[in-house]
Each structure stands twice: as C-alpha cells, then as structure tokens.
C-alpha cells in the first residue's frame, strides 16, 4: 500500500528523456516515478509524444500503476487555456479526480542577457511557465477543492539569486513563486495545500 494509492497526479513536463548512460534525465519523469512508487495514477503532459509514450510504458511496467499521457504545447500564440482544459478534462474522464498538481514544465532561452533578449524569447518563458501554471491551477481548482488536494509549483533559484542570462526564466519563475504564495492564502481555507520548490540549478 502506497501513500498515494488511487490518487491522481498531474505532472507537466513528465515525458521520459534519457541521458547518455540510458538513465532518466527528466525532472518531470523523476517526479512521476516518485508518485508511481506510492501507487498514484499518473497523468504526464508535454510536447513530445514519443517521450510521453515512453514514460507511460515505463511507469506502468515498472510500478503497475495506470498512466495517461496528453500532448500539451503551451507556447505563445496559442489557445493555452483550452489546451490546459483538455488535459484536465482527460484526467478526470480517465481517473475521476485530481489530487495533486505538479507544475514542472518550463521552456526558456538560456544565456541571453537582458539587453539582447527578444520579445519572442521572453514570451516563450512566460507562456510556458507562468501562464501555464496559472491556467493549470485554475482548471484544477474545483477538483483539488473536492479532494482536499495539493499543488506543487516549480520556481527557481535563478530568480532568487539573479542568475546571469536568465532574465525571462527568472521573471516567469518569480511570478510563479508570488502566485503560489497568494494561492496558498486563498485556497488554504478550502483544504488545498500550495507549495513552491526553488531548485538552485
């Protein structure tokens, strides 16, 4: 019996990516593995269908859990709110509930200075990170309220420490950190835990 038996977890950016030695190199997949070890039903999202299919196959074979993958590209210039709603609707249709939301996915142009950053590069980080997190939280809220669930949002040390060449990434992550604090205040009375993780890498 695991801590998350029959619970449903959505993990953005949860596809499998292999390192040169064949081991898993995706943070999202590592998170999915941790929840699968505890018996959770897993929903992984991302842009690359091959990586998502590989994640599903490995999680189901290695841990005996059920896994659903949903392709979801939340880049700028698209109807990202509808894309996110598609993921949430698919998760509820498959598993009947949402107990944990992990907002892990984020794309950005690394190593570009403030002076040289383009609007498109800035939009890439803001849409894939800040807006996506906002839309997922909104879409999952009624289900998390019902399940007394949890949200885990990924921010970053890049914003906390002003990492060189990380302006858009840092801005998006600091937005996520602030939004998480507000949501924790607003959603606490509903029994929803909202936490933010700030990796240093």
Question: Where does each model-flagged region fall?
Answer:
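Canonical Rossmann dinucleotide-binding motif of NAD(H)/NADP(H)-dependent dehydrogenases/reductases
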Residues: 2-41
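Residue(s) in the substrate-gating loop at a strand-loop-helix junction
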Residues: 156
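Active-site helix of classical SDR
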Residues: 137, 172, 180
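Substrate-binding pocket helix/loop in short-chain dehydrogenase/reductase
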Residues: 112-114, 118-123
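Rossmann-fold cofactor-recognition segment
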Residues: 63-79
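Active-site loop immediately N-terminal to the catalytic Tyr-X3-Lys motif
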Residues: 21, 115, 148, 161-167, ...
């Amino acid at each position: 019996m695991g801590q998350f038996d029959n619970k449903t977890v959505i993990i953005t950016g949860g596809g499998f990516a292999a390192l040169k030695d064949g081991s898993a190199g995706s943070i999202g997949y590592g998170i999915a593995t941790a929840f699968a070890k505890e018996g959770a039903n897993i929903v992984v999202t991302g842009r690359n269908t091959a990586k998502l299919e590989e994640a599903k196959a490995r999680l189901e074979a290695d841990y005996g859990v059920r896994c659903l993958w949903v392709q979801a590209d939340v880049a700028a210039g698209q109807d990202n709110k509808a894309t996110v709603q598609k993921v949430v609707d698919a998760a509820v249709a498959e598993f009947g509930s949402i107990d944990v939301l992990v907002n892990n996915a984020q794309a950005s142009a690394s190593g570009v200075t403030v002076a040289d950053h383009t609007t498109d590069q800035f939009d890439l980080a803001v849409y894939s990170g800040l807006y996506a997190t906002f839309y997922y939280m909104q879409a999952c809220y009624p289900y998390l309220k019902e399940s007394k669930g949890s949200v885990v949002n990924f921010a970053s040390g890049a914003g906390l420490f002003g990492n060189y060449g990380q302006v858009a990434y840092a801005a998006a992550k600091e937005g996520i950190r602030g939004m998480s604090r507000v949501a924790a205040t607003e959603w606490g009375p509903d029994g929803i835990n909202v936490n933010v993780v700030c990796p240093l890498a």
